[in-house]
Amino acid sequence: TGNFGQSLSSQQDITPLVLDRAQVTLILIGLAMLLALAGAIPVGMWLALRNRSRGADVVSAGTQLGIAVPSFLLGIILVAIFAVHLGWLPANGWVPPNQGAGEFIRHLILPVIALAVVQGAMLTRYVRSAVLDVLHQDYIRTARALGQSPWEALKRHGLRNAALPVLTVAGVQLTTMVVGAVVI
């Protein structure tokens, strides 16, 4: 019915309070997912094209570390470094966009990065796996036999096919980001 009842502390309806905070959560999740995808797609493609190289192994280890660290712990570490120690960014709070774009962005940087790193690390692994699958397809082998480089064959013939499983996983990850955004 959409009625969450009344707050025990303020005796106000909870529904408008939840809706006010939902806007903030959706902005945070949207920006974090965009940042996660913007980092995961090129890094995952690079990992697949450089599979089993020393550099790819180091980056893969970094993605495993990114997956292992919970977003709330990363958020605490980022606040300790960039807000408390260096004083570059605010430690908490929310500034609506109508109160100045600069302050709005400054207050979003740390939570967006904390959410995006964990999700981006997971998406990077999925992108790598999807691109590796595509690179072993017959149409990529044919393109390579016709003289295209691995990157060119992937760009022209394989990216659309590799994107399908990644976008599916990204959609599922949006739900986990809601939990992370609430905690952060």
Please provide the spans of the model-predicted regions.
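Short membrane-interfacial helix/loop motifs at transmembrane-helix boundaries
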Residues: 1-16, 89
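Alpha-helical transmembrane segments of integral membrane proteins
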Residues: 16-56, 71, 88, 98-184
